Amino acid sequence: MSLFDKKHLVTQADALPGRNTPMPIATLHAVNEHSMTNVPAGMEIAYFAMGCFWGVERLFWQLPGVYSTAAGYAGGYTPNPTYREVCSGQTGHAEAVRIVYDPAVIRYEQLLQIFWENHDPTQGMQQGNDHGTQYRSAIYPLTPEQSAAAHASRERFQSAMAAAGNHRPITTEITHATPFYYAEDEHQQYLHKNPYGYCGIGGIGVCLPPDA
């Protein structure tokens, strides 16, 4: 596909067929050795897409209260896609991060603050120099409460941008979580395994106002 084509989401009818076999990954998180698949009692899950998932995953695994993180693909159609397929723009997925967190230590609203303040949510089908539908900004809520918090935070951040003189519209999609597919093991905790690797995330200098 051309770069122009990759700026437009593929339709479900035109998406690649994928496969039934899940991607094999390591059982344990390379940084904290917690399970990357199990969710301990009392923990919750959040899904965010902010561009290249290498830097995004590191951003969240460093937070107190985050039990584990995983790089993967969300918001698309193709079952169990490969990285190459996602980068083709023919699966509909965004590069996303799965975050398992303890809400008694860090709230979903605090994760949303990290989300908004650490990337540019106005760039459509790109993030910085990374172009393609897989780099779009997205929040994939799992519950009505997460959805309400996500939409409210988007309104507050848009207002904060306007107050700072930035009138570009936010392009972040907020849609109910579709299946999350783990990325290949080489992408898991990539910047821990490759400390000098590429990290393309960065904020726009606007802070998310607290919920009134």
Swiss-Prot record:
The keyword Oxidoreductase applies. It comes from Salmonella schwarzengrund (strain CVM19633). One of its GO terms (biological process) is protein modification process. HAMAP family: MsrA. This is Peptide methionine sulfoxide reductase MsrA. Its EC number is 1.8.4.11. GO terms for cellular component: cytoplasm. It is an enzyme of class 1 (oxidoreductase). Has an important function as a repair enzyme for proteins that have been inactivated by oxidation. Catalyzes the reversible oxidation-reduction of methionine sulfoxide in proteins to methionine. The active site is at C52. The lineage of its organism: Bacteria, Pseudomonadati, Pseudomonadota, Gammaproteobacteria, Enterobacterales. It catalyses: L-methionyl-[protein] + [thioredoxin]-disulfide + H2O = L-methionyl-(S)-S-oxide-[protein] + [thioredoxin]-dithiol; [thioredoxin]-disulfide + L-methionine + H2O = L-methionine (S)-S-oxide + [thioredoxin]-dithiol. GO terms for molecular function: L-methionine-(S)-S-oxide reductase activity; peptide-methionine (S)-S-oxide reductase activity. InterPro entries: Met_Sox_Rdtase_MsrA_dom, Met_Sox_Rdtase_MsrA_sf, MsrA_MetSO_reductase. Belongs to the MsrA Met sulfoxide reductase family. Keywords: Oxidoreductase.
